[in-house]
Curated annotation (Swiss-Prot):
<keyword id="KW-0378">Hydrolase</keyword>
<keyword id="KW-1015">Disulfide bond</keyword>
<feature type="binding site">
    <location>
        <position position="143"/>
    </location>
    <ligand>
        <name>Zn(2+)</name>
    </ligand>
</feature>
<dbReference type="InterPro" id="IPR001590">
    <property type="entry name" value="Peptidase_M12B"/>
</dbReference>
<keyword id="KW-0964">Secreted</keyword>
<comment type="function">
    <text>Has no significant hemorrhagic activity, but inactivates serpins by limited proteolysis of their reactive-site loops.</text>
</comment>
<feature type="active site">
    <location>
        <position position="144"/>
    </location>
</feature>
<feature type="disulfide bond">
    <location>
        <begin position="118"/>
        <end position="198"/>
    </location>
</feature>
<dbReference type="GO" id="GO:0006508">
    <property type="term" value="P:proteolysis"/>
</dbReference>
<keyword id="KW-0479">Metal-binding</keyword>
<comment type="subunit">
    <text>Monomer.</text>
</comment>
<keyword id="KW-0862">Zinc</keyword>
<feature type="binding site">
    <location>
        <position position="94"/>
    </location>
    <ligand>
        <name>Ca(2+)</name>
    </ligand>
</feature>
<protein>
    <recommendedName>
        <fullName>Snake venom metalloproteinase adamalysin-2</fullName>
        <ecNumber>3.4.24.46</ecNumber>
    </recommendedName>
</protein>
<dbReference type="GO" id="GO:0005886">
    <property type="term" value="C:plasma membrane"/>
</dbReference>
<dbReference type="GO" id="GO:0046872">
    <property type="term" value="F:metal ion binding"/>
</dbReference>
<dbReference type="InterPro" id="IPR034027">
    <property type="entry name" value="Reprolysin_adamalysin"/>
</dbReference>
Length: 203
């Protein structure tokens, strides 16, 4: 951490119509949940000297403006096109994460592009609202953001002290999670190789 420079991620979270309906159209419940999730994510990223702040939350109460389907790859592709063509024209932010209540094939909980932070089309991830426990959804979103920041998967049994590693494949329910040394190394390599500019400025 000592060697990692201070960086700032301005995050947009979009909650789809399925999430809106799942919480009985209660915007306050969704807002509170997303704010708590991003707070937890920010806590995880402190060890990497990254501030993650929620700069915009969109809740789609009407028709979803992008194609959300059981194929996570197609949904991720659709979100990327939407970010590039629509979102960036309205809000110049660093990354967008889609929170959806759809059932993806193969029990997928999330998906994201690797090494893509700051890229207009591919600085995106999708996360299934798969648990009532905020911590577990936060781990999934932190994991997808990790891919955007260059992190590959850890081993399936990876631990850091008593904590489970955030970049394990799949999700093991637990009480505490941290980034592994390998994850920090991948992130350092991403910074050196891609030199992402959008995360330099304070929100």
């Amino acid at each position: 951490q000592q060697n990692l420079p201070q960086r700032y991620i301005e995050l947009v979270v979009v909650a789809d119509r399925r999430v809106f309906m799942k919480y009985n159209s209660d915007l306050n419940i969704i807002r509170t949940r997303v704010h708590e999730i991003v707070n937890i994510i920010n806590g995880f990223y402190r060890s990497l000297n990254i501030d993650v702040s929620l700069v915009n939350l969109e809740i789609w109460s009407g028709q979803d403006p992008l194609t959300i389907q059981s194929s996570s790859s197609n949904t991720l592709n659709s979100e990327g096109l939407w970010r590039e063509k629509v979102l960036l024209n309205k809000k110049k932010k660093d990354n967008a994460q889609l929170l959806t209540a759809i059932e993806f094939k193969c029990e997928t909980l999330g998906k994201a592009y690797l090494n893509s932070m700051c890229n207009p089309r591919s600085s995106v991830g999708i996360v299934k609202d798969h648990s009532p426990i905020n911590l577990l959804v936060a781990v999934t979103m932190a994991h997808e953001l990790g891919h955007n920041l260059g992190m590959e998967h850890d081993g399936k049994d990876c631990l850091r002290g008593a904590s489970l590693c955030i970049m394990r494949p799949g999700l093991t329910p637990g009480r505490s999670y941290e980034f592994s040394d390998d994850s920090m190394g991948y992130y350092q390599k991403f910074l050196n190789q891609y030199k992402p500019q959008c995360i330099l400025n304070k929100p």
